[in-house]
Curated annotation (Swiss-Prot):
Residues 94-112 have a biased composition (Pro residues). It is found in: Secreted. InterPro entries: Adipolin/Erythroferrone-rel, C1q_dom, Tumour_necrosis_fac-like_dom. Its main location: secreted. Residues 162-318 form the C1q domain. Glycans are attached at residue 44. Belongs to the adipolin/erythroferrone family. This is Adipolin. One of its GO terms (molecular function) is hormone activity. Homomultimer; disulfide-linked. GO terms for biological process: regulation of D-glucose import. Residues 45-115 are annotated as: Disordered.
Length: 318
């Protein structure tokens, strides 16, 4: 009787366990399939020695929760550079066109005031412009072959060197002047010849007295050509001595020994009837001082200064 009761209970229990086992068998694979992509383990899960030695995969229980911190640590500690091939071969997108320009910035502070432009600076720049323009024009107009009449190119600097001479003269003696023996005579009575070429500029030259008075202090150039007739000396040739000579001087204030003078000494041994004594040089005159020509006859007979003897002078500079 007992055996029959046990057999009935066993059969009932067996009939109830078969459907439950079949359902569990269908559930477990689906759960494993869903959990395959996210295989994580609890941060505080401890494995036994037998589980560590066994290489079988771990099975997560149904009631075991996933640790977020452990999952994050696994993500952080993943190997770098192990990306799929598709990500590595993907081309970066090209940059787009540049955007519109931004608005202008604020105005900066005012600069320092410029240099003061004076009249001298403007004049110097104007001279440089004229010089450059003249050089360019000369380079363009220069002929390939030399011509007989070259074009005169006068620059602004060159014009300053050809300034007008305010004081200058060229006059000649009107008539003959006799100078006695052992006599120092001053030549006077000059005139400006009517022929072209002679000139008289300024008011410094007094032709009646033969004296030129300096209007300003400066350097002056003087020249004199004195034509001498020594016929009387030749007639008395027996009396001619070695010390007989004629001196022509251009003196300052008629003081030939006190001031520097221009001097020329000539002997009387010439065979010609008339000879010329020329003297020229530079003198510095103060304003108001005058110069004139003196003839010193040291011979034993008189001599005659011929008309046409000339006296020239000009102001070189202050």
């Amino acid at each position: 009787m007992r055996c029959w009761v046990l057999a009935v209970v066993t059969a009932v229990l067996w009939s109830q366990c078969i459907p439950l086992g079949w359902a569990e068998g269908r559930k477990v694979p689906k759960r494993l399939k869903e959990g395959a992509p996210q295989h994580t383990e609890a941060f505080n899960t401890t494995l036994s020695n037998s589980e560590e030695l066994d290489g079988s995969p771990k099975q997560v229980g149904e009631n075991q929760r996933v640790d977020p911190l452990g999952s994050w640590m696994d993500f952080v500690k993943r190997p770098v550079g192990n990306f799929p091939g598709k990500c590595r071969k993907r081309k970066r997108p090209l940059p787009g066109p540049p955007g519109p320009p931004g608005p202008p910035g604020p105005q900066g502070p005012p600069g320092a005031p410029g240099a003061e432009v004076t009249q001298e600076v403007l004049l110097r720049e104007f001279k440089e412009m004229i010089k450059e323009a003249t050089e360019r024009r000369a380079a363009v107009d220069r002929p390939s072959e030399p011509s007989q009449l070259p074009t005169a190119l006068i620059t602004l600097e060159g014009m300053t060197s050809y300034r007008r001479i305010e004081e200058a003269f060229h006059c000649k003696l009107k008539g003959p002047v006799v100078v006695d023996k052992k006599t120092l005579a001053e030549l006077q009575n000059f005139q400006t010849p009517p022929a072209k070429g002679a000139f008289l500029r300024g008011t410094g030259m007094d032709q009646s007295t033969g004296r030129f008075t300096a209007p300003v202090t400066g350097i002056y150039q003087f020249s004199a050509n004195v034509h001498i007739d020594h016929t009387e000396v030749k007639r008395s040739k027996s009396q001619l001595r070695a010390r007989d000579n004629v001196r022509v001087l251009i003196c300052i204030e008629s003081l030939c020994h006190r001031y520097t003078s221009l001097e020329m000494i000539v002997g009387l041994e010439s065979n010609s009837k008339i000879f010329t004594v020329s003297v020229h040089g530079l003198l510095e005159l103060q304003a108001g001082q005058y110069t004139s020509i003196f003839v010193d006859n040291a011979a034993g007979a008189s001599i005659t200064i011929q008309n046409g003897s000339d006296f020239m002078g000009m102001l070189l500079g202050v």
